[in-house]
Amino acid sequence: MDEEYLALLERAYKLVAPKAQRRAEIPKIEVQNMPRKTIIPNFGQIAKRLNRDVYFMAKFFQKELAVPGTIEGDVFTLHGEKSPKVVEAVYERFIRYYVVCPVCNSIDTELKREGRIYVMKCLACGASTPVRPL
């Protein structure tokens, strides 16, 4: 009976999908300080890899840092001097609130608007989680 049980258990483990791994690592943010400006040259590339709208990300950064900004191509310019550590902390907060699935910790998520609420749908585990409004 033990051998039969172990054989069935082995078969069940083979049928179950392996634990979801992160498809990609979180991209690093590049921050360049200029006089009275802070430039993020890889902002568009980051938004594309995280599967987020560039304007949604920019709005979050502008509200968190309390400075206006402009997007030109892949470059996001904040019209105020902010230290790279502060910008990186805001970026990590964005990742935590709007990218990482709270159920399985995967970054394979998409953000959809349902009425007045933003909902994060995980592509790895299928969980739907409402997120904080901007």
From Swiss-Prot:
Keywords: Initiation factor, Protein biosynthesis. One of its GO terms (molecular function) is translation initiation factor activity. InterPro entries: IF2/IF5, TIF2_bsu_arc, Transl_init_fac_IF2/IF5_dom, Transl_init_fac_IF2/IF5_N, Transl_init_fac_IF2/IF5_Zn-bd. The keyword Protein biosynthesis applies. It comes from the Archaea. The keyword Lipoprotein does not apply. Gene3D superfamilies: 3.30.30.170. Belongs to the eIF-2-beta/eIF-5 family. PANTHER family: EUKARYOTIC TRANSLATION INITIATION FACTOR, EUKARYOTIC TRANSLATION INITIATION FACTOR 2 SUBUNIT 2. Heterotrimer composed of an alpha, a beta and a gamma chain. eIF-2 functions in the early steps of protein synthesis by forming a ternary complex with GTP and initiator tRNA. This is Translation initiation factor 2 subunit beta. It comes from Pyrobaculum islandicum (strain DSM 4184 / JCM 9189 / GEO3).
